[in-house]
Structures are given as C-alpha cells and as structure tokens.
C-alpha cells in the first residue's frame, strides 16, 4: 500500500499530474546511477592495487549485492509506515534520536562528497600544489599559468556558471537529462581507460597485476580492510532513494531501477579498477587522475589523457546537484520541521542553496588532502547509511513486516559492517600514528 505523503519535503502529488509522475524507468536508472558513481570510481584502481584483482572483484560484487538488499529493506519499511524520507523511517523505528542520527550522517556524507568533488575539479583544472608528484592542471597545460586559471578562480567560475544553475532545480526528476549526460561521461571515462589499457597490453607496456594481495607481514593483512570502506562509499546512494522514489506514481519502481543501476555501476567500477591497475600497476595513485596527468609521450596519448580527466570532471559537476538536493532537504527538515514545502518557499530555498554552496566552496579551497578523510568517511558515516541503519530498522521491525530470513541477513550485514569498520578505523589510526 502506498503511504500518504505527509512530509513537508515533497509537494502534494496528483495522480493526473504528468509533471510529477512523468519520470521514465530510464530516467530513474540514470538518476540512481549518477548518484552512485562519484568520487569512488577514482579510487577503484588503488583498491585493486591493495586487494588484488580477485578479492577486489568479490568485494565489489558482495557490497553491490548488499546495497540492493538494504535499499529493499528501506523501501519495505517505508511503505509499511507513513513516512516518505529516510529520516522519517528512522524516527518511526528509533524515535527522534534515530531521525537526527540519519540526518546528520547524510549531511556529513553528502557535504563531504561535495567537498571532495570540488577538490578534484580544482586539481584537474588548476593543478595540485600539496606536494607529492607534480600535478599540473589542464588550464595551465593549455594556456600557461595566469591569475584567472588559478584554483580559486577556476572553482569560482565552475560554481557560478555550472553548479549554481543546476542546484537551483527544485525537483530531482528535472535533473534526469543532466544525470543521463553524467552517466554517459562516466562510461566515456571507462571506455577511454579501457582503450589505453588494451593498447598498452597489445604493445606489451602493461604492468604485471597481482591476482591476490601480497601478505608478506601482518600489517599487509590489516591494510586490506582500508580498501573496503572506499568501495562501500562508492556504493552509498541510499539518501537519494526516497527523493527519487516518491516522485513516482509507484515508489516501488525505484527498487528494480536500483538493481539495474547497481549492476551497471559495479561493471563500471570493475572495468575502471582493472584497466587502471593494468596501466599503472604498483605506481597507481589513490587519485587515478594523477596518473593520467603523467606524460604519455605522444600527442594522441596526451589528448586522450586530457579527455579522461575532463570527462571525469564534467561527470562530477553533474553529480554534484543530486548530492546537494539530498543535503538541502535534510538540512531543511532538521532546521525547519514545521515549515511548508521547501520548493514552495523561494526565499528559504535560495538561502539554503547559496549558504551550502558558499560553505562547500570555502572548504574546497581550505582542505589540502582528501584521501584519509575519504577512508574515514567510508568506515564511519557511509557504512552507517548504507548498511548499519537499514539493518537496524529490519531488526527493530516496528511495523512487523520483516521476515525471519530478512532478520538473519540484516544481522549478518550489521555484524560485517561494524567489524570491518572497527578494523579499518584502527588500521588507519595506526598508520597515521606511524607516519
């Protein structure tokens, strides 16, 4: 039974409204796929380097499968109650504390990803001056170094003329076209990477990849757990399931669309990780774009490297508004729980949108590095959103709809998520202390 929509985050829907129910299956798949593929694709080759090809494939498959299960858990519990948001489902199961927990987790995750996106965009366009391998931006390569193509001005232009018009869209379904373009850009990124890898393979220039990790000492074994949070983060899209699903006439449509999206994205992740690892081997960086920035020795190779970097940056620009939509909705629900619909209050809508953009822009300028933050976020915030919270909802079973099989799966999911997170956090803390 479809629940009555009472939350202020969504407009009242009429069955005859083609605008509200016009989202096609392909549009849903593109929106979900776009919200899945983000900064995570950048770190897949590094995850393959740490894990080896076979374990990486198995972990991607397992996490993708668990992601579809947890989405099913969420939607089943949602439709059994009266809520239409992730936070609302948690409130029904765990009270106000649960609602606030998922709102804060979602806001931290989405804001963190938006900052990471902005940092990567700045790195590609204007270079990275934080040490390590020299990384010159595309704008400097093409035009030389000037004040107008420095990091701050490049990001300012992107925010003002690309991101701002997109985040001012008030409904997720209106981002379907940009989502489709974004997804195709991600596919282009994979295709070009594949072409470069196959070309290198034919010419005998590929590295010798490891099928399994090297476990030469105990530290190497524990280091394997630091790659899992990166893959978990890559499949964390659960905060967008409710906004996308409840713009449909039948919210359950989002479940089969999610399965299609997860399969597509898992294939893209595996291809990116495999071909990136084949190209660069043990020299693979945590940011694969740094490797593509290296000289290829030919004009065609340099052109392909630029296309790889720019297609990826354009993809991130088009994913950005989907994350902003979720962040803005959760922040509004937390700050103004009794206010009318956000999309009907222009002053509040624009105020929140501009405030979030400004904070994200300043953070992207100030934050020097993303890697450790990326790992810690994957082992704490995103694993909670993707697995711990949905599993807890099933085990709580406030509406009495969870089956015994679902409870067993939820319990296993919860134990695996918590155990892996504890090991990953401990290993990261040990590595930081050792360094």
Curated annotation (Swiss-Prot):
Keywords: Amino-acid transport, Membrane, Transmembrane, Transmembrane helix, Transport
GO cellular component, one term: organelle membrane
Family: Belongs to the amino acid/polyamine transporter 2 family. Amino acid/auxin permease (AAAP) (TC 2.A.18.6) subfamily.
GO biological process: amino acid transport
Top-rank taxon: Eukaryota
Record membrane topology: Multi-pass membrane protein
Residue ranges of the TM segments: 28-48, 53-73, 100-120, 148-168, 181-201, 219-239, 260-280, 307-327, 354-374, 375-395, 408-428
Pfam families named among the record's database cross-references: Aa_trans (PF01490)
Protein name, per record: Amino acid transporter AVT6C
Disulfide bonds, paired cysteine numbers: none
Localization: Membrane
Major localisation: membrane
Organism: Arabidopsis thaliana
InterPro entries, per database record: AA_transpt_TM
Region annotation (Disordered) ranges: 1-24
């Amino acid at each position: 039974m479809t629940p009555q929509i009472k939350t202020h985050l969504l407009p009242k829907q009429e069955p005859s409204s083609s605008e509200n129910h016009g989202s096609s299956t392909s549009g849903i798949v593109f929106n979900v796929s776009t919200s899945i593929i983000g900064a995570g694709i950048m770190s897949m080759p590094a995850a393959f380097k740490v894990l080896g090809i076979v374990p990486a494939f198995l972990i991607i498959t397992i996490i993708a499968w668990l992601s579809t299960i947890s989405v099913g858990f969420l939607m089943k519990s949602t439709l059994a109650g009266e809520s239409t948001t992730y936070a609302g489902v948690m409130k029904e199961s765990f009270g106000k504390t649960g609602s606030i927990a998922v709102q804060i987790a979602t806001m931290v995750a989405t804001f963190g990803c938006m900052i990471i996106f902005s940092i990567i965009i700045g790195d590609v366009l204007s270079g990275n001056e934080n040490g390590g391998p020299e990384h010159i931006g595309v704008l400097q390569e093409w035009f030389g170094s000037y004040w107008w193509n420095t990091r701050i001005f490049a990001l300012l232009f992107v925010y003002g003329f690309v991101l701002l018009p997109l985040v001012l869209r008030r409904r997720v379904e209106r981002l379907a076209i940009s989502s489709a373009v974004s997804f195709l850009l991600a596919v282009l990124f994979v295709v070009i990477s594949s072409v470069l890898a196959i070309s290198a393979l034919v010419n005998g220039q590929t590295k010798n990849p490891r099928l399994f990790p090297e476990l030469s000492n105990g530290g190497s074994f524990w280091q394997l757990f630091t790659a899992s949070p990166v893959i978990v983060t890559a499949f964390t899209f659960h905060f967008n399931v409710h906004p996308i699903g409840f713009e449909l006439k039948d919210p359950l449509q989002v479940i089969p669309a999610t399965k299609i999206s997860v399969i597509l994205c898992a294939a893209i992740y595996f291809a990116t990780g495999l071909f990136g690892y084949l190209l660069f081997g043990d020299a693979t960086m945590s940011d694969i774009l740094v490797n593509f920035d290296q000289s290829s020795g030919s004009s065609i190779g340099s052109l392909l490297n630029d296309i790889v970097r720019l297609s990826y940056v354009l993809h991130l620009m088009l994913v950005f508004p989907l994350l902003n939509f979720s962040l803005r909705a959760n922040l509004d629900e937390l700050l103004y729980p009794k206010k009318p619909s956000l999309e009907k209050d222009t002053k509040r809508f624009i105020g929140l949108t501009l405030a979030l953009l400004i904070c994200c822009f300043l953070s992207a300028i100030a934050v020097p590095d993303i890697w450790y933050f990326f790992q810690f976020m994957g082992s704490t915030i995103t694993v909670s959103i993707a697995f711990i919270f949905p599993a807890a909802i099933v085990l709580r079973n406030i509406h009495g709809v969870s089956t015994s099989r679902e409870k067993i799966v939820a319990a296993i999911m919860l134990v695996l998520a918590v155990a892996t997170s504890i090991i990953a956090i401990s290993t990261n803390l040990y590595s930081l202390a050792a360094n």
